[in-house]
């Protein structure tokens, strides 16, 4: 996501997987978590990782693991993975940043995600109503800006107004007290 150093951390995580001979698909830039969940199934992956602190304050970052069904890792698999991580000898891992081993998945997944979202969502609004419906959208400086406008356009919504002050992804969330849309301060 747009948190500080997420792109750098993504490359480090990729290096660890390369060391263990695990194929890596990677977005070259931030994407919203639901797009990762979609990509797991679409690409027939076993697991995926999102580097995010969700709606926590800007000084945080995190590491969330998603299983092949697109959902977050849950017990007992989470504890099993933690045991494997704790047993690692980190000095053996070579961080060589081999870009040739990364398979970037940007546009193909973006398009498939938007198409699937429109096909599977309840966009039963008649075309004329879509053209007359005014939508105001904010990503609260987050990654959803990478997907939502395209999904709405693909669904036929033409009058989408993006809040310009909060359009650019920014891990400091400069115009909001909280990046959590569930909180009134947001």
Protein language model features and the residues they cover:
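N-terminal small/polar loop signature for handling phosphorylated ligands or for N-terminal nucleophile
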Residues: 1-60, 154-186
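Gly/Ser/Thr-enriched, mixed-charge loops and adjacent short helices
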Residues: 61-185
